[in-house]
Amino acid sequence: MNEPYWWWTDEQKRIAREVEEFVDENFEEAELYFWKQEFPWPLIEKVADKGYFGAGIPEEFGGMELGATGSCIVAEQLGRLYSVGHVFVVSMLAGLEQILKYATEEQKEKWLPKLAKGDELGAVCITEPFAGSDAANVMTTAEKDGDEWVINGKKRYITGAGVSDRYFIYAKTSNDLSDRKQYSHLTSFLVERGREGFSLEQINPLIGFDNVPNGYLSFRDVRIPDENRIGPVGKGWQVMMAGLNFERLVAGAVFIGVLKDIIRQLFHFTKRRVQFNRPTNRFQGNQNEIADIISMYRMGRQFTYYCAKEIDMGKEPMINSAITKMVISEYVRKAGTKAIQVMGGDGLTKFYPAERLMREGKVGEIVAGTTEIQKMIIYRFSSMLPDYNKPIKMRWNEEVNAPIISNRESQFKGLDVNEENMLKVIAHDYKVNPGLYMTVDDIREDIGTSRSKTRKIVKELEEKGLVVIHRSRDGDIKLIKASYEGLQQAFPKEYYEWFPDWYAEDDKF
């Protein structure tokens, strides 16, 4: 039984028990489709009958309204059923949050009940020959013709290609450069299978996501009514961004269940595999590898549901959802590699799930935003957090004769604000932080003046060759550091000298 967290509601705990039982009952059937290399339509229908495709859809539209936590609970378990989990995630995320946030009431009433029932599978179509991680570089076009839109272009690496009935696509509706700079050149649409000119071009043989068709789509003068447009014209980028936190979260959650399964598999295997006259679970190396996998599973799972709780509370955890997607994918790949190592030659065969785990994890590091994109998001949004950007003040402490972190004011605070004293502030920073520049605010706070006056004086110092200024592309002063000439003018050379007590006087020069 999967461990429920203390903050789960009784309904969430009930759903967790129910879906785990469902998966256990149908696990053998999922294995059969894996070996037959067939798309598991009967299993998909069972999932639909249980209503699980409606996990994240409001009850008013026929869904279960389980929120982010409930959706992760379902994804965690269905991910154990090989291709079923990926089909569930992609179909549920094929415009769900976008429709909820941008569609008209009429559109919601038309599309959401179908999604909730699982009558139709869905796919998300962003990637193109021209657009991968650079998702804004879409070249597929949509031109207005009366009450219709005419779509031309191609999409590729579309999970669920061919088996899906509805395709949530993003197309370029403006060639204006100013629109492109403002990300106002895209519009989102729903395109149904069967539209004239809309065809499946190719299926990709991926290293993972077994039996889930992934392919190329071709649009050749495909006509759709304006009622299939989701959101305003030119707001496709905003529509795309809507619900990304939820999507990354669930895309990570679908891998959690297989991590637990591999732990069970390894305990089972190593208890029964004997080498050097003892079971292999007694070897410290194997114990360490399994301990690593257990740690990754428990840390990844708990962080996933913490992030889900944040979303259910109305927050937008951009950083945490990116972390979830990134670490779960990496954990799965690493766990697969470790499991293979523990199982030896058996781990290399398809008779055991270790090799599949490694392959699935590698795909997970690419789809739904690469690991590198997640890291970029984590860094960029973290760089905006005040808590991470509080300056660290290093002050020279005479008692210990060393720079230490301190909240006390600068020794230069209150001096007359002029070139001489400002140069001393900047030169003194060389003694404390020899490899670093100072910001305008660092200098301003140390001497006690305004930003404008600080900029004015450092410009004058620059003209005299006493400081080096690093500017932005727009020419704004960003960072300042004393030049060698500035250091000499500010203080005598002895001011900058520092030697540990053990250093011999005779060796100085």
PLM regions and their residue ranges:
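Alpha-helical interface subdomain recognition
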Residues: 1-81, 85, 90, 102-107, ...
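Flexible, small-/acidic-enriched active-site or ligand-binding loops
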Residues: 137, 194-225
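A short core secondary-structure module
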Residues: 152-200
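Short alpha-helical segments that sit at the start of domains
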Residues: 403-425
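Short acidic, hydrophobic short linear motifs in intrinsically disordered regions
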Residues: 432-446
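Short amphipathic alpha-helical interaction segments
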Residues: 448-463
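A short, conserved structural fragment
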Residues: 462-472
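Short, amphipathic alpha-helical interaction segments positioned at domain boundaries
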Residues: 484-509
